[in-house]
Structure formats: structure tokens, C-alpha cells
Amino acid sequence: MSFVVIIPARYASTRLPGKPLVDINGKPMIVHVLERARESGAERIIVATDHEDVARAVEVAGGEVCMTRADHQSGTERLAEVVEKCAFSDDTVIVNVQGDEPMIPATIIRQVADNLAQRQVGMATLAVPIHNAEEAFNPNAVKVVLDAEGYALYFSRATIPWDRDRFAKDLETVGDNFLRHLGIYGYRAGFIRRYVTWQPSPLEHIEMLEQLRVLWYGEKIHVAVAQEVPGTGVDTPEDLKRVRAEMR
């Protein structure tokens, strides 16, 4: 099954300026992500960036670049520009791999593509179980609740589902009902084209989660449990220090 990986790599970052180019053990972070995508068996890999320095780093590593505007409000909007510039057919399977995930396993890149291809659904993504209270109550760890067939009911930074009886007694432990969403998405190119025609939803603005736009407009998102748990993503200088140590 063929699929295309697009890696959005926005240069500006309030917490870590020039994030795609930060050095991780001798390579720019974006090159590590490119290498993980290559291991997935993708037919084509494109780094979508708004900065010439990022483009040069990718090209030196033998990667393909698509220059995009700097004013996109989300990674999916950046993907839509690439979809149009590359004239992908509506049924092309696109996997959005975040440019700040240098430790993402190649297996889950392919997993999300396979999950999408096997279903008549606009969008697919992955999640992993949460086993500790710190993560369950962390607003930076996005939680997702599913229906009986694995489709998302809701994504939230809040602790969902709220375990009423357990939490009335104890906020230090959690049960087996919590899933943390992973920021990897599979879509067909035609779905991306439709997504960017929709106005952002109120819930999307409240939670600051772009996938809520999909649920707001009545579309389904399939969520599978990831075959491997990815390593740390890089959002802060502290994350960067940790990733450098883990990737030695």
C-alpha cells in the first residue's frame, strides 16, 4: 500500500526558536524525522517548511522540500498547500508526521497509513494507554475517548473520561480507561482539501486542538492503539536535553 509522508516544519517557535534545526547528536532534528519517515517505506516524503535554512538542511540530507507560506494556523493547513502544489489525487493517502518527533518509530507511521487505507473514513490517528495520574491530569497530554468501534468521541486536554467514584477518593492513581492521543494523522488528500474549507469550530479554539474541527463537522476519526510507544517529542529546551541523552 503506497502512501506519502508530509512533515510540516515551521521555523518559528516561542519556546524553542529555530526548532527544526536544533542539533541532536550531530544532525538537525528535521533530518532525524526524515530518516524515521524513510524507514516507514513511504513512497514519497516531503518536508513542508516556511524557511530557507530548513529547506537547505533537508536538501543536503537528500530530502524533498516544498516551500509553504508562513501564515498557516495549523499543520493541516500547511499540508493542504502541499497537496495543491503537488496535485495529489483525492485518494492519495497522506501521513502527517510532526517535525519535532525525532524518535517516532517507523512502524507507527506505516500503521496509521494502513489503518486509514482499510477504512472508509476521512482521518485516522493513534493513541497509547495512560497508566499514571501525572499524565492523566496534564493538559499538555491530550486525552481521547472512543466508541465501541474505535472512533473518536472527543479529544480534550481535560481528564476524560472522569472516573467519578475513583477520583472522589483518590487523585493519585488511574484505572485502565485513559488514552493519550499521538500527534500523527493519516488522511486522503481529498479530505484535506475539504478540511481547509471548514471554518474553525468553537471547541477547536477552546481546546486548541485542530482535530476537533473534524468531529464538529460530523466526520469520523479512527483511533488505533499504537504498536510502539514513541519517544519524547521536542517542545522545550528541557525536552531537547532529554532527547539528546536518549538518542546517544
UniProtKB/Swiss-Prot annotation:
Name the SUPFAM superfamilies on file.
Answer: Nucleotide-diphospho-sugar transferases
One Pfam family, short name:
CTP_transf_3
What are the transmembrane regions? none
Question: According to its UniProt record, which reaction does this protein catalyse?
Answer: 3-deoxy-alpha-D-manno-oct-2-ulosonate + CTP = CMP-3-deoxy-beta-D-manno-octulosonate + diphosphate
In short, the EC number is 2.7.7.38
Q: What keywords is this UniProt entry annotated with?
A: Cytoplasm, Lipopolysaccharide biosynthesis, Nucleotidyltransferase, Transferase
Instruction: Report the CDD domains cross-referenced here.
Output: CMP-KDO-Synthetase
Give the InterPro entries listed for this entry.
Answer: Cytidylyl_trans, KdsB, Nucleotide-diphossugar_trans
Pathway the protein takes part in: Nucleotide-sugar biosynthesis; CMP-3-deoxy-D-manno-octulosonate biosynthesis; CMP-3-deoxy-D-manno-octulosonate from 3-deoxy-D-manno-octulosonate and CTP: step 1/1; Bacterial outer membrane biogenesis; lipopolysaccharide biosynthesis
Any one Gene Ontology MF annotation carried by this entry is: 3-deoxy-manno-octulosonate cytidylyltransferase activity
**Where can this protein be found?**
Cytoplasm
EC main group: transferase
Q: Which GO terms fall under biological process for this protein?
A: CMP-keto-3-deoxy-D-manno-octulosonic acid biosynthetic process; lipopolysaccharide biosynthetic process
Any one cellular-component term (Gene Ontology): cytosol
According to its UniProt entry, the function of this protein is described as:
Activates KDO (a required 8-carbon sugar) for incorporation into bacterial lipopolysaccharide in Gram-negative bacteria.
HAMAP family linked: KdsB (MF_00057)
Q: Which family does it belong to?
A: Belongs to the KdsB family.
Q: What is this protein called?
A: 3-deoxy-manno-octulosonate cytidylyltransferase
Q: Which organism is it from?
A: Escherichia coli O6:H1 (strain CFT073 / ATCC 700928 / UPEC)
Q: What is the lineage of its organism?
A: Bacteria, Pseudomonadati, Pseudomonadota, Gammaproteobacteria, Enterobacterales
What gene is behind this protein?
kdsB
